[in-house]
Each structure stands twice: as C-alpha cells, then as structure tokens.
C-alpha cells in the first residue's frame, strides 16, 4: 500500500538547517536562530493533522517513508522508516529523526538525512520568507 501526504509551507530568514539528528517542519510562523532543525514554517499541517490512512500505514515497523522537500526546482529526498510507537499527536510540528526516538511530533525515524545534510542551495531558498516549500511524505508498507 502506498499513501501520499502533501504539506505546503514556506521559508524563513532564520532557517539554519544545521541540526545533525533531525529536521522539522512547523505550523509556527516565527522562528529564532536557535531552531537549527527547522527547515520550513507556516505549514498547513502538524503531525495530528495527517491523514488517518497515512498514520496507520506509518505505524507498521516495516513501513518505508520517503520525504521530499522541494523549493522551486531544488529538492532533497530523505528515506526513513515507520514505527509502531508513532502517535502523531502534536498539532504544530512534523519531525523526522535519524534516531529511533519517538514522541508526538515524530513522523518518521531512522532517516538517512537530517537538516545539516540538506544541500546549501536548498537551504538558501528555505531562508527566503516568500519561498513556497512543498513537503511530500510517501509511506509504503
């Protein structure tokens, strides 16, 4: 089964994209320079808003999750895994982790990239507050 979820967001001048273990997309519109894992703000969805079918499929331990982050023609593809402990309860944030840590904000674990691994060309685009960013989450289980 393959389920696709699309989240629209935008850039912010304070995007750092330097965190080595996670990356985050948030519904918040403000961002301080301390938020080094945040790659997009003003998202249309948080973890709690994702489609029920997506959540159910992602809760399978053998689920493969692909996250594509696009800003115009520049994109980054991240491969991660699902986990039976994913709760998808956070109303504001979507967090992808390289580790196996799970909380209400976590939407995928075991990722092959974190914020610091994103191309600097993409990061430059993500620093533009007018830049539209499209996040596509695809789960296959």
Report each predicted region and the residues it spans.
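Short, recurring structural edge motifs at helix starts
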Residues: 34-41, 54, 103-109, 123
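N-terminal intrinsically disordered, low-complexity segments enriched in P/E/S/T
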Residues: 2-6, 12-14, 22, 128-134, ...
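Short, solvent-exposed interaction modules
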Residues: 49, 74-123
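Short, well-structured hydrophobic secondary-structure segments
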Residues: 38-79
